[in-house]
Structures are given as structure tokens and as C-alpha cells.
């Protein structure tokens, strides 16, 4: 089975939002936690992490334990299956292209 196959996709997107003003300390904690597990930034509040399901579970447990979410703050974790990756598109000044991980 391929890197991204199986019932538990290894690639997940972590998309977060913290209200303004404030929230910078929690935003920083979350960024550092994600980066310490090998996640890389796609956009300002969006990270991608290619890891085993156990790592994703550990990341989520640590987020809950270490990040203080207040009313209006959120984190969405989105599993990306093979089909999702095939149809996903990145649009920027260079045009439209598929995602590569």
C-alpha cells in the first residue's frame, strides 16, 4: 500500500484560527507543537503533517493539553486521502497546479 493509502490517511491538514487581538501566545504554542512533529506551513494558519496515525493522535492530545482555546478559537484537522490529493489544487501567481507531498 502506498504512503497515503489505507483507512487511516497519513497526511492531515491542521487549520487553526485564533481571535484577534490576543491569541498570539496560543498561536505560537500551536505552531511550535506542529513544527516539532515535522509539520510544514502551507499558509499562515494551515500546516500539513505526513505521519503515522499514532503521531497524529499524540499531536492532538498535546494540543488539547497545552493550547488554551477560548471562545472563537478553533483547530480543524482534515485527513487527506489519495483521491483528495489527486483532485486538490494550489492556486497562486504561477497558476493552478496539483499538490505534491
Curated annotation (Swiss-Prot):
Quick check: keyword Membrane in the entry? no
SUPFAM superfamilies hit by this protein = TTP0101/SSO1404-like
Q: Which domain of life is it from?
A: Archaea
How would you classify this enzyme at the top EC level? hydrolase
**What is a single molecular function from GO for this protein?**
RNA endonuclease activity
Q: What is its EC number?
A: 3.1.-.-
Keyword set, alphabetical order: Antiviral defense, Endonuclease, Hydrolase, Magnesium, Metal-binding, Nuclease
Q: Record's NCBIfam families? A: cas2
The UniProt function text for this chain reads: CRISPR (clustered regularly interspaced short palindromic repeat), is an adaptive immune system that provides protection against mobile genetic elements (viruses, transposable elements and conjugative plasmids). CRISPR clusters contain sequences complementary to antecedent mobile elements and target invading nucleic acids. CRISPR clusters are transcribed and processed into CRISPR RNA (crRNA). Functions as a ssRNA-specific endoribonuclease. Involved in the integration of spacer DNA into the CRISPR cassette.
Subunit structure and binding partners: Homodimer, forms a heterotetramer with a Cas1 homodimer.
Name the UniProt record assigns to this protein? CRISPR-associated endoribonuclease Cas2
Q: Which organism is it from?
A: Methanopyrus kandleri (strain AV19 / DSM 6324 / JCM 9639 / NBRC 100938)
Task: Quote the gene name from the UniProt entry.
Answer: cas2
